[in-house]
């Protein structure tokens, strides 16, 4: 099981109040990893990233997706060393690529990220 699959499993187990759908899409490059539906009936997407260092790597297709769709899109990054989980808005993708994990996240920690995502559309 790869690191992003492990992060997905952790996310699904710790945040069961959100319906998570894993998108394994090879035909539409750049499509985020997850489609989610919260308790307010709000859909959003989440791109999963796992990194060993400060830098977060994106494909040009992932960048293009988030630039074109800046609303209701998120990037969840787990830093393996400290085990930190940070949530960024999709609209921050260019800054996140440039600054890495030094960029201020909109949420820290898996539980806090879950609360924030579940409150969308409320």
PLM features: residue spans?
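Mg2+/Mn2+-dependent nuclease catalytic core
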Residues: 51-70
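Helix N-cap / beta->alpha transition motif
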Residues: 59, 87-95, 109
């Amino acid at each position: 099981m790869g690191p992003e699959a492990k992060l997905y499993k952790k996310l699904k187990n710790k945040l069961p109040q959100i319906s998570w759908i894993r998108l394994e899409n090879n035909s539409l490059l750049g499509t985020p990893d997850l489609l989610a539906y919260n308790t307010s009936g709000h859909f959003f997407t989440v791109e999963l990233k796992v990194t060993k260092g400060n830098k977060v790597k994106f494909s040009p297709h992932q960048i293009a997706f988030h630039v074109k769709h800046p609303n209701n899109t998120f990037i969840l990054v787990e830093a393996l060393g400290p085990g930190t989980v940070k949530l960024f808005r999709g609209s921050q993708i260019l800054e996140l690529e440039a600054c890495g994990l030094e960029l201020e996240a909109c949420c820290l920690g898996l539980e806090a990220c879950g609360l924030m995502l579940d409150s969308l559309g409320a």
